[in-house]
Amino acid sequence: MNNLERLRSENPLVICYTNDVVKNFTANGLLSLGASPAMSEAPEEAEDFTRMASALLINIGTLTRENEEDIIKIGKIANQQGTPIVFDPVAVGASTYRKNFCQRFLGEVNVTVIKGNASEILTLIDFNTTMKGTDSDSELDSVNIAKKAANTLNTAIVITGKDDIIAKNEKIIKLSNGSPLLTKITGAGCLLGGVLASFLFRNTQPSIDLLVEAVSVYNIAAEFAEQAPHVNGPGTFLSELLDQLYQMNDITYKNQVKKVEI
């Protein structure tokens, strides 16, 4: 049984502590793929949920003073339960507040995968970095940033951009699937975090090949969505992306994946 078949057979429970802007899209995307999202944010039930969950997604897009302690508490409970965590440090370089929170979070919680654009990941290893928001910086050296971040933070790194870079231990892989329309809808990167979590299967040390498959399945679905005859902009693309995630299969993944080890 391949990983995508396993995902659809097991319907892994993924706890999505994500931002308010993308909750609906993230939930629908994971359901389309075959996972079972739970949008629970109450620390009072975190122990029960993480015990059952395949993984926990933490996305700080709408971080506030009111929820920061809950995020850290839920992360620590996931660590105690052996539940892998995908961390998405949205716009970490945009404010001192976000930088300080991420520095504290990564000091107190062990994460399995960190996903972000090059600017966000660079900020995590150099908190003097500044950025304008969630947009990526195409001029940054994503390969070296990913390599340094994987070593410094001792975790798997996924850097998104025109090409995606995955680094784990000393291995680095560049992926070249995807669609420019992903940058025209809100929550595309946030959903990818959920897709990564869906592929973890309670494994806190996933192989880089598993991460490659998770990212590529999503990006290939985006390519197919863009190519659909009725898609003529972001609105039709968004709904078609859900359909393509639903229709994705292992043969399509293997035939379409564009990857190279660096």
Swiss-Prot record:
Substrate binds at M39, G187. Pfam families: HK. GO terms for molecular function: ATP binding; hydroxyethylthiazole kinase activity; magnesium ion binding. InterPro entries: Hyethyz_kinase, Ribokinase-like. Its EC number is 2.7.1.50. Pathway: Cofactor biosynthesis; thiamine diphosphate biosynthesis; 4-methyl-5-(2-phosphoethyl)-thiazole from 5-(2-hydroxyethyl)-4-methylthiazole: step 1/1. Keywords: ATP-binding, Kinase, Magnesium, Metal-binding, Nucleotide-binding, Thiamine biosynthesis, Transferase. It catalyses: 5-(2-hydroxyethyl)-4-methylthiazole + ATP = 4-methyl-5-(2-phosphooxyethyl)-thiazole + ADP + H(+). The keyword tRNA processing does not apply. The keyword Nucleotide-binding applies. ATP binds at K115, T160. Its cofactor is Mg(2+). Catalyzes the phosphorylation of the hydroxyl group of 4-methyl-5-beta-hydroxyethylthiazole (THZ). Belongs to the Thz kinase family. This is Hydroxyethylthiazole kinase. It comes from Staphylococcus epidermidis (strain ATCC 35984 / DSM 28319 / BCRC 17069 / CCUG 31568 / BM 3577 / RP62A). The gene is thiM.
